[in-house]
Amino acid sequence: MSEFSQTVPELVAWARKNDFSISLPTERLAFLLAIATLNGERLDGEMSEGELVDAFRHVSKGFEQTHETVAVRANNAINDMVRQRLLNRFISELADGNAIYRLTPLGIGITDYYIRQREFSTLRLSMQLSIVAQELKRAADAADEGGDDFHWHRNVFAPLKYSVAEIFDSIDLTQRIMDEQQQGVKDDIAALLNKDWRAAISSCEMLLSETSGTLRELQDTLEAAGDKLQANLLRIQDATLGGAELGFIDKLVFDLQSKLDRIISWGQQAIDLWIGYDRHVHKFIRTAIDMDKNRVFAQRLRQSVQNYFDNPWTLTHANADRLLDMRDEELALRSEEVTGELPPDLEFEEFSEIREQLAAMIEQALKIYQEQQMPLNLGAVMRDYLAQYPRARHFDVARLVVDQAVRLGVAEADFSGLPAQWQAINDYGAKVQAHVIDKY
């Protein structure tokens, strides 16, 4: 949304003329971050040369550099940062010739990126969106009131340009920083899995869940405020319709709408991409577990065979009876020959045979409704049937009753689009929602 008053060749010539350059090796960047941290603890925002040397001494110690030349190297680093317009130097005659240093906007911007902007805060984002909502509402009210050119510039254009747009840029920057954080988390997970995936599983889970939670918090906060922001932008846009002299406001509103749409859209896309990556990591871990399990077993077996004469071993094989899964309806019970007669209570039947018998009985009982053209209240009929069977059979019997009932006819109330009332069908909380079948 920035409007450049110069062309690209003019900007290139300007940068060349002023000899703009930034060179920050790791130790110099650490020194700049140390200055920003110490500067943030001071009320006046000023630092003396001695304080800068002390900060450089801490950095030099962290990089395990020699202490003999700290003063010389600190002086060189300070002069270099002044030359690169990261620090401003002020000579004070009242301080015996000692200089006073302040961070420049460029220095603050760099350190702010590395320190403050990397800390995602839902509260901070909520406050930003609250300020944006207030500014947009105030601008929309001013646009509805109308006025002269000064009114539009001061009460509509200025808040949009210098408050709303800047906060949108800040939110966009937060999203881009989180993109980098996601890449950093991916690198951390890859490093953990390459070292020892067994020990890394819990750490990977923590990194994945934390990043997912942060992305979701950001997106929920944006979506909660997005509709109100768009509504106020539309109010301003409607107020500028028909005014040719207000084209600059209309263009600004369009740019703000596009940026807001892009922010919300990218937030959801980032969540979708992260979900895909999350599934990929879990699939990799499951595959690694299966492969490692088989590899360990094969390795142990191979070692046991190779070292048999040094460490003899015996293999005991047990042939146990096959276990039956009673939940599988298609499994047939084993019919081994037995001696003697079993009591009737111990005789078994396949569930498929019982189901066929029940279906035939229910079909025969329900035909009366079709032959006599009687309304079939499925809830009442089902309750009567379930009362005849134990609770363990209620689900299967209810399913059979529904299957047979829908074959007989339909309910005209189904075509009205109105939902049916829930009816209790047993004493254990089960309910059914169905209209009375009255058309066979």
Swiss-Prot record:
Localization:
Cytoplasm, Nucleoid
Query: Entry's InterPro entries?
Result: Chromosome_partition_MukF (IPR005582), MukF_C (IPR033441), MukF_C_sf (IPR038198), MukF_M (IPR033440), MukF_M_sp (IPR036141), MukF_WHTH (IPR033439), WH-like_DNA-bd_sf (IPR036388), WH_DNA-bd_sf (IPR036390)
UniProt key word Cytoplasm: yes
Can you list the GO cellular component terms from the UniProt entry?
Answer: cytoplasm; nucleoid
Gene Ontology MF term list: calcium ion binding
Question: Keywords on this record?
Answer: Calcium, Cell cycle, Cell division, Chromosome partition, Cytoplasm, DNA condensation
The record's listing under Pfam families reads: KicB, MukF_C, MukF_M
Q: Where is this region: Leucine-zipper?
A: 208-236
Q: Which GO terms describe its biological process?
A: cell division; chromosome condensation; chromosome segregation; DNA replication
Instruction: Quote the NCBIfam families the UniProt record gives.
Output: PRK05260.1
Please state what the protein is called: Chromosome partition protein MukF
Give the gene that encodes this protein.
Answer: mukF
